Amino acid sequence: MTGRERLQAILNRQPIDRLSWTTLVDHVTRAGMPAEVRKLSPFDFYRHIGCDILQFGNYGLSAEEAVLSPSRLTCTEMTCELETEKDGKLTRHQIPGANVTFGIGAETVTGRAVLKRKTPWGTLSTTLENDHPVTYPVSSLEDMRILRSIWEASDYVEQDDMEASFARTERLIGDDGMYVPTVDPSPVQSLLEYEMGVENFYYLFADYPEEMKSLLAAMHAKRLKEYEILARRTPAEVVIAVENTSSAMISPDLYRALSLPQIRDYVDVLHAHGKKAVLHMCGHIRELLEPIRETGLDGINAATPPPIGNTSGEDVLDFFGDDFLLFGAVFDPSVLHKADVSSAELQDHLTRLYTPRLRRANLVLWLAVDGLTTPLQRFLAVGQWMKGREGQ
């Protein structure tokens, strides 16, 4: 089987010729590798280590390799200003409001920056550190109303050339794997992660529950259109929603009340267009598995075992059944990233990990190394072990 055939077989719950594994790298991951390896394109690097290519959206790709989105969020009532500081010099420039979603700039920002969304209803300001919010734009009822007005005045507008860029990226991947489009977090998660943060979210929800529900409804109405456009136009068989959900941020009861109905709607849209729905869940999700199951999803990406997470692949199968898709179950980070871990230790862990049940499962093992400098030897050790299990 080729990598593409193997991943397609897993998606369709068909037998495979060998165990499947993948990874996701960026320039930080490869920073300590030999120069000739750092120069490889992401796809050629994946071929070099021998994994199946499961390209997670556009992560790690250059503009020439990336797939264009079939839609973009536009708001004609909003202008965006980005302030960056380098070597003591402040730079301020306008960026199109159409390119700003959830308060994160269209361009990657290294270092500290301030993003201001200016509207007739007021201004929301976000302080970013390496593209992550360190102060949140929404911390009051007034801010919440501004954000709701932005969403009510926004629309997802279809863009040309997605299909052509998808075909180009698929040609670059070839038979070695597949490109899987990703979608931004659902409304609750985007508020928790980017717009409010956990503390502001719960204070505002406690003080102004109806205003919070109104904001979430406005966001959801627009996000449904985004999902419909993507599901209708993408040639991909599966879509991954990047949820990052964790019981450290939301309780099972609140997940069921707020997140579940919205995610179930998104899953229904994908299914209506013949797509499989997979949720990226890299947090602590054991306590959330019951309401997550009620979304009707087909699989989970990035289920993470202890001690970093609290949910192993077998935990997921215990709850969802052995036909469920583990489309990227995380290799134990405490082993993979252990200082001076040997190839023998990694391979011994793999031997213990792959119980007869997991060998039969619809499983892609995922080495989670994005943003983490990782020795080349660790990938090669996993690849060598996997190759030795062909036909098993």
Language-model features and meaning:
Residues 92, 109-118:
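Generic recognition of long tandem-repeat/solenoid scaffolds
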Residues 32-90:
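Segments that shape or occlude catalytic/ligand-binding pockets
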Residues 86-102, 121-123, 127-167:
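A gly/proline- and charged-residue-enriched helix-loop-helix capping module
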Residues 1-37, 116-118, 127, 145-392:
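Active-site loop segments of alpha/beta catalytic cores
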